[in-house]
Amino acid sequence: MPNKKTADPNEKLILGVEARSAVELIKHRHGPGVRFVFSDNNNNPEGNIYTIVRFVENVDHPEAHVEPHQHEFESLFIFKGSNPDMTGLEAEVMFDDKWYPISSPRAVRIPAGKVHTYRFVKGSGEYWNIVLTPGANYNRTVK
């Protein structure tokens, strides 16, 4: 009888990453730069963490691509500039109706139920968005 190889259940814990537009999300448009999805309901349906990173280069004016919204669960924004000390990216985060300037490196905690959005203002770097959500399904939590 041939030796039958069984699938290693741990392999599904190693997630593939792919570039995708934000248009798949409620209240989002394409947006600047390139967006990479690290964890969502497509590659991690048993998980509870949605994670993306967006790379932008040479931003020279404010550009919003996300409408103000809220989630049922907490999330975290991470702004990391392209310089060795992680500076080099300027953004703004809106809570309720007020904009707050962000200079990288910086993390911003978004409590559950807090109306928010963000926009890049100037520079180059990375934006990470980490959302705690059942089944890693971002759209399930947007209001």
Walk through the language-model features, giving the residues of each.
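Ordered hydrophobic segments in well-structured contexts
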Residues: V37, Y50-F55, S75-K80, E92, ...
